[in-house]
Amino acid sequence: HSTKRLANRNLVVGESTLKELRELDVGSHKDLSWKGTRIPTISEVFAAIPDKKKIFIEVKCGMEIIPYLVKEIGKSNLKPEQIILICFDQEVIKAFKQVLPQNKAYWLSGFKKDKAGDWRPTLDKVLMTLKDTNADGLDSSKNVPSEIARKVMRAGYEWHAWTVNDVTTAKNLQALGI
């Protein structure tokens, strides 16, 4: 992942130092009033979370982040219910839940129909993944197969959707219990 979309310079995050990343202006692309805004550290972000509010942390790298993330979570004043991990990588979710079982973690997955018109991943694959990773639920795009959603939630898992920007989609997801 890079800083191309947000910053005044394009750096590859995983190949950059914190010092280099902190020098970037990540505000000007929105509006000049935000000029000079810097990338915060995770501890600074945690410190800005108000009581009774939550933060969803999307892990885009691999397992190597877990020890550092757990350390920063431990140093924060946030309660377990305030920090939720989301990730496509099943092994990251599993490792996070092994270390911090009291925190919620959701498996990120999109749904597509195959050539035969069947949803992928299948209901069995979703339920097996949630159980194997000890995830608390699923977080998906707005393209939600209703029957799979109902069965997953009936099995006791939560389901959330990302990037819903219109009222009709929001109401459809709400009607499903998402």
Feature locations, PLM:
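A structural motif corresponding to the C-terminal end of an alpha-helix
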Residues: E44-K54, S76, T133
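C-terminal active-site rim and adjoining tail of enzyme catalytic domains
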Residues: L32-G36, L108-G110, K115-I178
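Structural preference for beta-strand elements that scaffold enzyme active sites
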Residues: K54-F56, Q82-L85, Q102-Y106, D136-D139, ...
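Distinct, well-ordered alpha-helical segments
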Residues: E64-S76, V92-Q102, A116-D124
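Conserved, mostly hydrophobic/aromatic
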Residues: L21, V45, I57, D89, ...
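Active-site-adjacent beta->alpha loops and helix N-cap segments on the catalytic face
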Residues: M63-I66, Q90-A95, K142-V152
